[in-house]
Amino acid sequence: MPAGSILVADDDTAIRTVLNQALSRAGYEVRLTGNAATLWRWVSQGEGDLVITDVVMPDENAFDLLPRIKKMRPNLPVIVMSAQNTFMTAIRPSERGAYEYLPKPFDLKELITIVGRALAEPKERVSSPADDGEFDSIPLVGRSPAMQEIYRVLARLMQTDLTVMISGESGTGKELVARALHDYGRRRNGPFVAVNMAAIPRDLIESELFGHERGAFTGANTRASGRFEQAEGGTLFLDEIGDMPMEAQTRLLRVLQQGEYTTVGGRTPIKTDVRIVAASNKDLRILIQQGLFREDLFFRLNVVPLRVPPLRERIEDLPDLIRHFFSLAEKDGLPPKKLDAQALERLKQHRWPGNVRELENLARRLAALYPQDVITASVIDGELAPPAVTSGSTATVGVDNLGGAVEAYLSSHFSGFPNGVPPPGLYHRILKEIEIPLLTAALAATRGNQIRAADLLGLNRNTLRKKIRDLDIQVYRSGG
């Protein structure tokens, strides 16, 4: 007896043949068609236990067919496949009630697994298709495999309120992912409130998040609502969560556990209804090991982990991204621009330490500062060239410029190796190079007093002594 009846609709004969062979070997009865009309006739007659359909067919788009299928047979699982591979082709099937979205080409083993899972699930699954209005803008751009995986995860999350933890380097677009999750999810009609934990003074974080009552502290002349209250019914995006102080982490954990909070200076618990999406450019597991982040809070936030890849891992998306940013610049009144083939190759060879944000800034700069319609490789070379180091300039690099100085050094360091990739062990080599002058400077400033140097550095005295020994740092004591 067949494991189930599968209806397959795709206008590509080769795709139909491959799916027929794979599904038949897995024990399913398969019916094939190359058009939407036949698929709709089968569905309306009550045939099939599951549907696999392409988006684009000769007579009708699957996006238009899906709502009719779900209205007639709400418990019929529908798997949508597409070669278009954009954010919207991933999100629209989910919005219209599809069980799963698969970008072409896909792994047949994965398809068989998804089919088995869909048929095994309880049939009381009820879809909640969105309205049929067109979306005004596409928040995420890219067709690379890395982005396809993000789209698929987002599509699965749209009709849930699960807490999401987004990780990724600075400039990768973590807030854009959070906004997409809100704007196309079930809370889209509620507010989206973003809080950058790194930008709030330490002593004001709890007031910022939970609000305060009049007289709660000096200067609190009126009651103020917090971000939880402002995000009620919507999404609260906690950016740079790794910078949250431990005491605020404790209060946040309590809110996640109990679903309520109290304002600073308040006594009455307030129920909260928000979806939490957190993000960090730091490895929270390392912060946990260092005693800087609560492990129990991490597990509460990390219900669905989502990593946004750096631009260098999705460099094939660069042409789409640069066109997108040029288009945005044109909408802001800047002249239209294009890149020639050599200029595009130059961009693909760049390491992009600032990720997508760096590319966006470059696109706007090109649109604003260069008169030619077509940007050439020479312009790109000039824009991406590291700044010239003048005599004595290294002596003037201050703390505010340390990140930029390290970035410039690393860019030069990487370019000195074949294919721009240095040998393994870079992390520890770079840390050692930075650690030695840092410890030496602290010891010099404290005249060799290791207790004062440890306090200055924020290290345990025994830790400092071990580092001095391991790094073979000479300690010179002086009087005074």
Swiss-Prot record:
Swiss-Prot/TrEMBL GO biological process terms: nitrogen fixation; regulation of DNA-templated transcription; regulation of nitrogen utilization
InterPro entries reported in the protein's UniProt record: AAA+_ATPase (IPR003593), CheY-like_superfamily (IPR011006), Homeodomain-like_sf (IPR009057), HTH_Fis (IPR002197), P-loop_NTPase (IPR027417), Sig_transdc_resp-reg_receiver (IPR001789), Sigma_54_int (IPR002078), Sigma_54_int_dom_ATP-bd_1 (IPR025662)
Coiled coil: none
Alphabetic keyword roster: Activator, ATP-binding, Cytoplasm, DNA-binding, Nitrogen fixation, Nucleotide-binding, Phosphoprotein, Repressor, Transcription, Transcription regulation, Two-component regulatory system
Response regulatory domain boundaries: 5-119
Cellular component GO terms held in the UniProt record: cytoplasm
4-aspartylphosphate: modified positions: D54
Keyword presence, Aminoacyl-tRNA synthetase: no
Nucleotide-binding found in the keyword field: yes
Modifications made to the protein after synthesis: Phosphorylated and dephosphorylated by NtrB.
Name of this protein: DNA-binding transcriptional regulator NtrC
Organism (species): Bradyrhizobium sp. (strain RP501 Parasponia)
Name of the gene: ntrC
